[in-house]
Design a protein with these regions (language model features):
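Beta-barrel outer-membrane channel/assembly domains of diderm bacteria
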Residues: 2-124, 150-163, 191-195, 227-240, ...
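Active-site/binding-pocket entry motifs
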Residues: 44-46, 132, 282-283
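Short Gly/Pro-enriched turn/cap motifs at secondary-structure boundaries
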Residues: 57, 102-104, 141-142, 224-225, ...
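Short, solvent-exposed loop/turn segments at secondary-structure junctions
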Residues: 88-91, 133-135, 285
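Solvent-exposed loop segments that connect transmembrane elements
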Residues: 92-102, 175-179, 213-223, 286-300, ...
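Signature for the C-terminal beta-barrel architecture of outer-membrane proteins
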Residues: 118-124, 132-274, 278, 329-331, ...
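Residues on the solvent-exposed faces and adjacent turns
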Residues: 128
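C-terminal hydrophobic structural anchor segments
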Residues: 271-329
Length: 353
């Protein structure tokens, strides 16, 4: 019995010497496939917001996500991801506070899709997946958005094509009987490299198929003053530690139908990087009037102009921090949005495995 008690601390000591892996946790499957991978990430955020017409506020927030990747065959795989505040379009955060923990109940499905690669140079995604569409910023799609439907990418050397059928609503009665709402996306991308210079350009369109009152929850009816079909133009230039990119969008709305962002990044060294963004988003320029755009600017997310400055710091391979400052104002004073003279400071600590 005494011998057994001696073995216990020895075993625990040996376990303590084993360093955790800084990558997905993998369980090998049949036929040499890496059948199951576990992955996840966590963010701690502090932000402070002030403005000309609001009181100054501060809040601490968090986001947690974990997922599973599974390969059934060489051509078929699947992925599921779960997260905080799953009722939102994006992987948003929940605010600290133990007196009201109801936001803990909103932990659920974030992404769930199957991927097929059995066709040459082609990847097909079926289900709830990230946007398969070139965009260099979060103006059109937030980076962690999940679109539901079928998307595909075909790539052959310098040219690629992105296509998709995205379901917004099905069998929803908004006063006209049960209707569906969807969009179809199509984009061509050209990529080239000259020595250490990499360049990519894209042109595409999102065709919204919905009645005037469909998808009313996002105020996305297709009246003349609202966003219907949207043309997209993108350019991305990378040269060593420097990157310059721009996104430009225009919709069929009769007014306030242009959105663009230009941003530059510079990687100072392995640990430090800086970014600068110029934002201009008119009220009816984006699909569904901006229902899937970024949500970090204070106030409304459309009918805004402003800037974003960011400092990135790499602490370890899977641990980093960033400091962000947003400053925005209304574009069209006749449209009721709450962006007047607002600023937001964010500090993020991000960890993943």
């Amino acid at each position: 019995m005494t011998t057994k008690f001696i073995y216990v601390p020895i075993a625990l000591s040996l376990m303590a010497l084993v360093k955790p892996a800084h990558a997905d946790v993998t369980i090998e499957g049949l036929n040499g496939l890496e059948a199951v991978k576990l992955f996840g990430d966590m963010r701690m955020r502090f932000e402070r917001t002030d403005g000309d017409t609001i009181d100054t506020t501060s809040r601490a927030r968090l986001r947690a996500r974990f997922g599973i990747k599974y390969a059934a065959t060489e051509n078929w795989s699947a992925q599921m991801r779960f997260r905080t505040t799953s009722s939102q379009h994006d992987s948003t955060h929940q605010t600290f506070g133990i007196t009201n923990t109801t936001d803990n109940d909103d932990f659920g499905l974030d992404r769930a899709f199957m991927k097929y690669t059995g066709i040459n140079n082609t990847r097909v995604y079926i289900g709830k997946a990230a946007a398969v569409y070139m965009h260099s910023s979060e103006l059109l799609f937030r980076d962690d958005i999940a679109l539901e439907g079928v998307q595909a990418n075909w790539t052959n050397n310098t040219f690629s094509v992105n296509a998709g059928h995205i379901i917004l609503e099905e069998n929803v009665d908004n006063g006209e009987g049960k209707r569906d709402a969807s969009w179809q996306q199509l984009q061509g991308v050209y990529a080239a490299q000259f020595n250490d210079i990499k360049f990519k350009a894209g042109i595409g369109s999102i065709f919204v198929s919905a009645s005037d009152t469909a998808y009313a929850s996002a105020e996305s009816g297709l009246d003349d003053d609202q966003a219907g079909n949207v043309m997209t133009y993108n350019a991305d230039l990378r040269m060593g530690p420097f990157r310059l990119a721009a996104d430009y969008y225009t919709s069929e709305a009769q007014s306030d139908n242009i959105a663009y962002t230009v941003h530059a990044r510079y990687q100072i060294n392995k640990e430090l990087g800086v970014r600068f963004y110029i934002l201009h988003t008119e009220a009816y320029a984006l699909p569904m009037n901006g229902a899937f755009t970024q949500t970090n600017t204070p106030g409304s997310y459309t009918n805004i102009k402003g800037t974003r400055v960011q400092l990135d710091y790499k602490i370890a391979d899977n641990l980093n921090a960033d400091l962000r400052w947003y400053s925005v104002d209304n574009l069209n004073k006749d449209i009721a949005t709450n962006n007047e003279g607002r600023d937001r400071l964010q500090v993020n600590l991000n960890m993943k495995f």
